[in-house]
Amino acid sequence: MAALVKCFVLRPRMNRFISGNRVYERDHISVAFVVKKHFADSSEEGLAYKHYGGDDTIDTLHTSILEEIYQCRRDDVKDNSSDFMDKLVRLPHWMLKIVVNILFFLDHRGKVPFDLIKADPNYASIFLTNLGSIGLQSGYHHLNNWGTNSFFCVIGKKHLAPEWHEDGSYTVRPVIGLGLTVDERIGDGYYYSGTVRLLKKLMENPELLEQPFSTPVEY
């Protein structure tokens, strides 16, 4: 997560989104993910949503994420977005269709009430899901027509894989697969490839994340 945030700080075009057929660039970086309150089929989910900037480091991010997860797992706490959805699905079908159409109309124009979406991960710069935490490998998640999210990252389960060397030999190392889905309209392939190179550099050299995220990195 820290590596992704630093990528967005150093490569601001990754923080763009499309709304109403126009391109916008956020003035903040937000990260969101779903938190399971308990590891049980019947358990509810909470929405974690945090903002970060160039002055943050991996240490400040780690502290804030632990605090956010603790709050999300409390049974007596529910975010506004989840609470609204719970009420919405109780409406009669005909009324639900009307409300949903109105919300999509407002979303297209950037007019959805902030209280309804301030914890909605579909409005975050980075939408994360950690499938590795439930024993699954990484994959690719689609982007949604709702919201402004343009970047989805799926984290897979840690597993062993060969790392091949130039002489034909290999070393077996633990690896984690990442599935990245990006809205191709916010940039071009060259810009995306640079972002992936930077992400790889940060993952291979995590000590770089101990400095403020705004600190430049050669890659």
Stretches found by the model and what they are:
Residues 1-219:
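C-terminal catalytic/motor cores of large multi-domain enzyme assemblies
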